[in-house]
Structures are given as C-alpha cells and as structure tokens.
Amino acid sequence: MSSPLDVCIVGYSRTPIGSFRGALASQTAVQLGSAAIRGAVASCGTLRPAAVEEVFLGHVLSAGCGQAPARQAALLAGLSESVPCTSVNKVCSSGLKAVVCGALAIHAGLRDVVVVGGMESMSNAPYLAAKRGGAAAVHSVQRDGLTDSCGGSLLAPGSAMGLAAELCCDERGIDREAMDAHAAESYRRSWAATRAGAFRREIAPYTVPYPSTCSGGDAVVVTGDEEVSRRGEDMTLEELRKLRPAFVKGDGDGGEGKKKDHGRVTAGSSSTLSDGAAALVLASRRYATDNNLPIRGVLRGVGDAAQASERFTTAPALAAPAALRHAHRSSADVDLWEINEAFSVVALANTGAAALCVCVYVCVCVCVCRVGSEQ
C-alpha cells in the first residue's frame, strides 16, 4: 500500500572506481563527490538543483579535507548555499547510513528531496604525525580506516581489521579455498557485467584535467572501474592461490609479530583501496508524483546492528532480519542480496548465518528496497 511519504529513489549516479594512486588519484574526495551529486540530480530529468533540501554524504578519510566536506561537495555540484549538509563516518557502511538518514528525514515529513551517498579518495589520505612524542608518521588510511580502535575480548585496540576476518575464519570454519573461490567468482562476475555494459547507466564518465602522473597535457576521460578493467579477466582462482596471507599476529594485537601458521585472508580476498563517489536522489512519493520524477525504487525498510568490533564480520546477519521486520517482509520476498565484500569471509559467513541465497555484495546497515516498474 503506497503512502505520500514513501521514500522513492528518483535519481542515481556514481563515478568510475579508481584504483589506489590510479586514474583518479589527482582528484579529491570533494571533487569526486560533487561529480556524483551532479550526475544524480541530472538523472532525475526535470529536477532543479534548487529543489534539493538536504545532503547526507558518507566520508571516512576526511583528515585534511577542510571543514564540512559534504557541504563543499554540494556547493561544488551547484546546490544552494541554504542546503544543510552532513558528513557521516560509519566506516564501511557510511554511505548506506547516509541513505538511511535521508530516508528518515523524508519519512518523518521534514524533507521532500534529499541527496545521499558517499565519497572517498584513499589516494589522497594524508600521513599523520603526533604533535608530541616523536615525529613518526602513520598513514591515515591505516589509522582511520583499517584499524580497530575499540578492540574486544580477543583482539586488542589497534588490531588490523584483517585479524577480525581471520577470527571469523576460525569461529565459522571457513578455509582459504572457499575464500579464494568466492573472490575469483566475484572478479568473474564483475568482469562479465562490465563487458555486458551492466554498469554503463550508473557511471558518469569522469574527466581528469590532465594525467595524474604529469603536470600538463590533454584531459583524460575515465569511463569504467579501474580494478576490474586492469585485473578482472586475469584474477583467476589459480592466481589467487599464489598470494600469501596478508595478516600476521602482532598487527596491533599485542602478539610478538609471529606470522600466522595458517593465515587465510589475502589481498585477493580483501577489498581494494580505491577512489570514487556515488549518490542517490531521494524524494517523497507525493513530491515525485506531483513533479513527474521517475520512481526507480522505493525504500521499504532499514536495519542497523552492532556487536563487538572484532566480530563486525557477522553483524549483517543481525541487521538483515531487522530491516526485513521494519519492511514487514520475509527473506522469501527478497530477490537479491548485496553483501559488502570487505573480506570474502564476510559474504561467506553471512550467507550461511542469515540463510541467504546468491550474495554478491549487506553492510552493517541494511536497506530493503522495491526496485522496478512496480511502485
């Protein structure tokens, strides 16, 4: 049953995903975010930028980006100076939590049109040096993005998140072979989808003023995801089997630096470091209908869950049921699940724990959407 306050997806866009220090390395997170916002607003057809009432953008590595990165991106995209903007830092689920924030504003009747999404430039994340106590520099990607600051009963604060993935392997009995097979299949699907043009509608080609490796020359237009284009066809199971385990005891866990005898998580079964941004335009059903905006999907429910950070890997199995309850749906009603592949073990663990079917990419924050012509 429809409602005037239904949260409808009326526009979407994303940049290509650039590899670490790759094609988009010369562009800041703010520049990438503004491109995604412009593309999303343009995809709505008749929507004027002045109609956007609020912006929520996920952004984790904000050190050195200046005040209010979300506002910077919104203004650079041509939105009004009167638009309130908020940055969300929830690590891997920052962008999806931004979607939830925007959806709740619409559902509460506070807003009719919001822009939501996320942006990141891991290539531009700076090094950090303590003001006192020595001048040793720490990369902010490692400190702010890849290290557990809270710890738990088994992993100390400062542990690499990859050790939590290894812990999940221990507790769930997931072996190296299963993770390599999952990673290989993920690369295969990404490569096949790219070749079939499945991402063409959502990617807004990004123009880099000049190659990031030189100080002048012609502009370069980036049209596709760099990691998939460079490695997708070659990242086979045989190649993945050659990689060494990436995480060792002593990676901040209080150990002695001794390598795990049976480490399973590798760079191939972990997420890449990358640059890019994505955005959605959300609108109330009433506003979308009155202004002839295309309704691409309806957000029916959301769910958040948390547990000890060393067990972040299985939090989606708690968030998914919460989202389904909020949407008054059951798992039998769901045609597609997406699970965040921070590590292959996350998808494998939650596929079994939540009794899900085919899984590709669910973050710790989950949304249930109705997508397609049926509104």
Describe the residue ranges of each PLM region.
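N-terminal extracellular/periplasmic Venus flytrap/periplasmic-binding protein-like
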Residues: 8, 13-15, 26, 30-35, ...
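Active-site pocket-shaping loop/turn-to-helix segments
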Residues: 14-41, 61-63, 86-100, 112, ...
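Conserved catalytic cysteine-centered active-site region
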Residues: 27, 59-113, 155-163, 234-272, ...
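Phosphate/pyrophosphate-binding loops at sites that engage ATP/ADP/AMP, CoA/4′-phosphopantetheine
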Residues: 39-53, 168, 172-173, 288-295, ...
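Beta-strand segments within the central parallel beta-sheet cores of soluble alpha/beta enzyme folds
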Residues: 49-58, 84-89, 114-119, 178-185, ...
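Active-site-proximal alpha-helical scaffold in enzymes
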Residues: 89-120, 169-199, 279-286, 375
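Flexible glycine-/small-residue-enriched beta->alpha junction loops
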Residues: 113-168
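Active-site pocket-lining segment
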Residues: 164-166, 202-204, 300-358, 370-375
